[in-house]
């Protein structure tokens, strides 16, 4: 009982202001993708190109998110998490304003790539600082609660983006993103602690390569990092492709498109709330196992229904909603186990995880796009199911050792 009260106090006093400031920046970068995706139909019209460029915007954004992961984590280990994170918030604001100067889809896509680099700061720097600051059960609760706030972006983003382009030019969205990032900068400047453990060490590229080689040789880490990527791929593929699937493919309105996102991301939030409630009461491996059933089952429902009837978009939404609940329940624990499967400094480990995940997302979204172009909704959801089955196989291998995630920390 005393331990639980102590955890509650720590969660309330130590883990409030900094995570809220970080999640505001995270929200700005996420809504920078989720809100603009429905607006991409207006963007391609502005530049006079076809709709195949719609998911490419998200591909470029996520590719940027992979670009500097390898460097930012180790740099923050040595010069400090705080200055690197503050630089990231300012960088995102500048690139959001710079995109207003583009005059072709190629320039727009390049700026989306540069904006995407801002994602590198979240996992490799911000989340690493949080993981270093708190014990396991408290950290998982913080991560789950932060995820709920961050998930407002994909929940409200499609609705807000669809409404925005009916009322205002799409360019105004990027001014909003820049303003949110600047507000996050002010909060982080005041509240972010310093948790780096290797400050003052010289950054050597050969030593950096050696560090990454040690991390990647760890089979448990590699399996967990791949699993984290495949877990979220169906959700990100849906975010990227759903404007085309719903509005162009099914002929529905932008309002209908936005409303179909609500059950999916609402269930994702519910999964995170369930995780926050169960964390500390159940071993981490048990939480992952509980999430596996709805994850794979939901993807199977979406695939079978759309292979049987190509326009069964309501069944597809129901299946993806069930999957989203599962990922909300399982993913934070899997992330934690993977991060601490290596003894290397957490900036380096987190950066390696981020690069692997972003590579899977970048490649997977393009594969998902072509699956839909070639085979419609059925092929798209079959691709998502394959991703879920790969996740299941990797997690089964990772949890084969009964000692992994088998303790309950309060």
Swiss-Prot record:
The keyword Transmembrane helix applies. Residues 37-52, 106-109, 166, 248-255, 308-313, 368-378 are periplasmic. Pfam families: MFS_1. One of its GO terms (molecular function) is sodium:proton antiporter activity. GO terms for cellular component: plasma membrane. Gene3D superfamilies: Multidrug resistance protein D. InterPro entries: MFS, MFS_dom, MFS_trans_sf, Sugar_transporter_CS. The gene is mdfA. The chain crosses the membrane at residues 16-36, 53-73, 85-105, 110-130, 145-165, 167-187, 227-247, 256-276, 287-307, 314-334, 347-367, 379-399. Monomer. This is Multidrug transporter MdfA. It is a multi-pass membrane protein. Keywords: Antibiotic resistance, Cell inner membrane, Cell membrane, Membrane, Transmembrane, Transmembrane helix, Transport. Residues 1-15, 74-84, 131-144, 188-226, 277-286, 335-346, 400-410 are cytoplasmic. It comes from the Bacteria. Efflux pump driven by the proton motive force. Confers resistance to a broad spectrum of chemically unrelated drugs.
């Amino acid at each position: 009982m005393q331990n639980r009260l102590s955890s509650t106090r720590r969660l309330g006093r130590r883990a409030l202001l900094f995570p809220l400031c970080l999640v505001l920046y995270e929200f700005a970068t996420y809504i920078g993708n989720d809100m603009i995706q429905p607006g991409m139909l207006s963007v391609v019209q502005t530049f006079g190109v076809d709709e195949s460029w719609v998911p490419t915007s998200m591909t470029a954004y996520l590719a940027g998110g992979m670009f500097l992961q390898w460097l930012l984590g180790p740099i923050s280990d040595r010069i400090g998490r705080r200055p690197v994170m503050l630089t990231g918030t300012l960088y995102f604001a500048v690139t959001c304003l710079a995109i207003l100067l583009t005059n072709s889809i190629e320039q727009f896509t390049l700026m989306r790539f540069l904006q995407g680099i801002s994602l590198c700061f979240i996992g490799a720097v911000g989340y690493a600082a949080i993981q270093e600051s708190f014990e396991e059960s408290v950290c998982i609760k913080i991560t789950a609660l932060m995820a709920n706030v961050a998930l407002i972006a994909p929940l409200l983003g499609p609705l807000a983006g669809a409404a925005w382009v009916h009322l205002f030019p799409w360019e105004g969205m990027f001014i909003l993103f820049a303003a949110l990032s600047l507000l996050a900068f002010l909060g982080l400047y005041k509240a972010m602690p310093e948790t780096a453990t290797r400050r003052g060490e010289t950054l050597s590229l050969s030593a950096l390569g050696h560090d990454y080689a040690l991390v990647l040789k760890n089979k448990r880490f590699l399996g967990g990092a791949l699993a984290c990527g495949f877990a979220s791929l169906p959700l990100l593929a849906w975010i990227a492709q759903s404007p085309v699937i719903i509005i162009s493919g099914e002929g529905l309105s932008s309002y209908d498109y936005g409303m179909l996102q609500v059950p999916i991301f609402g269930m994702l939030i519910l999964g995170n709330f369930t995780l926050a409630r169960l964390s500390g009461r159940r071993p981490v491996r048990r939480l992952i196992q509980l999430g596996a059933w709805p994850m794979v089952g939901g993807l199977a429902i979406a695939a079978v229904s759309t292979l049987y009837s190509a326009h069964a978009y309501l069944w597809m939404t129901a299946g993806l909603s069930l999957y989203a609940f599962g990922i909300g329940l399982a993913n934070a624990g899997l992330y934690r186990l993977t991060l601490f499967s290596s003894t290397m400094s957490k900036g380096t480990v987190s950066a390696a995880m981020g690069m692997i995940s972003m590579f899977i997302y970048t490649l997977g979204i393009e594969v998902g796009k072509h699956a839909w172009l070639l085979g419609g909704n059925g092929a798209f959801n079959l691709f998502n199911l394959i991703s879920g089955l790969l996740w299941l196989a990797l997690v089964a291998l990772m949890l084969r050792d009964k000692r992994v995630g088998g303790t309950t920390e309060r």
